[in-house]
């Protein structure tokens, strides 16, 4: 996981948004081309379309989890995926101060005030 974190950071430094950076970092393990990973996650950046709503990085996490664990042929899958995403949100909140997955709140907490 540290390797993907470093890769995500490198993508971010190249100018890709948070969501793109996360998904592209996992592209090799997901069997995706870099281009496909970057394209499929482009709209989730900056809190989904720069609306500062759900964190783009967290949207990237959900995309990766869905690609790895979702099974559309399994009728029980929806509940299992929701539980997995909820646990990921709990861990994400804990790692980022404990109370949010909302972009504007995370940025404010970090002292970042984007345009």
Q: Which residues make up each language-model segment?
A:
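Amphipathic alpha-helical interface segments
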Residues: 24-29, 64, 77-115
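Short acidic alpha-helix initiation/capping motifs at coil-to-helix transition points
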Residues: 14-20
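Acidic-glycine-rich active-site phosphate/pyrophosphate-binding loop
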Residues: 26-43, 100
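Conserved phosphate/anionic-ligand binding catalytic regions in large, soluble enzymes, centered on
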Residues: 52-60
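Transmembrane alpha-helix interface/packing and boundary motifs in multi-pass membrane proteins
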Residues: 44-51
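Polybasic, low-complexity association/targeting segments
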Residues: 1-12
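Short cysteine clusters
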Residues: 18, 55, 103
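DPxDG-like acidic metal-binding loop motif
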Residues: 60-68
């Amino acid at each position: 996981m540290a390797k993907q974190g470093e890769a995500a950071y490198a993508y971010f430094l190249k100018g890709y948004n948070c969501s793109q950076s996360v998904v592209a970092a996992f592209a090799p393990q997901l069997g995706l081309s870099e281009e496909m990973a970057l394209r499929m996650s482009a709209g989730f950046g900056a809190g989904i379309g720069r609306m500062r709503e759900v964190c783009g990085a967290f949207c990237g996490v959900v995309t990766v989890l869905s690609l790895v664990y979702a099974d559309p042929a399994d009728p029980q899958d929806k509940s299992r995926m929701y539980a997995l995403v909820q646990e990921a949100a709990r861990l994400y909140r804990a790692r980022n101060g404990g109370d949010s997955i909302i972009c504007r709140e995370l940025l404010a907490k970090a002292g970042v005030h984007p345009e």
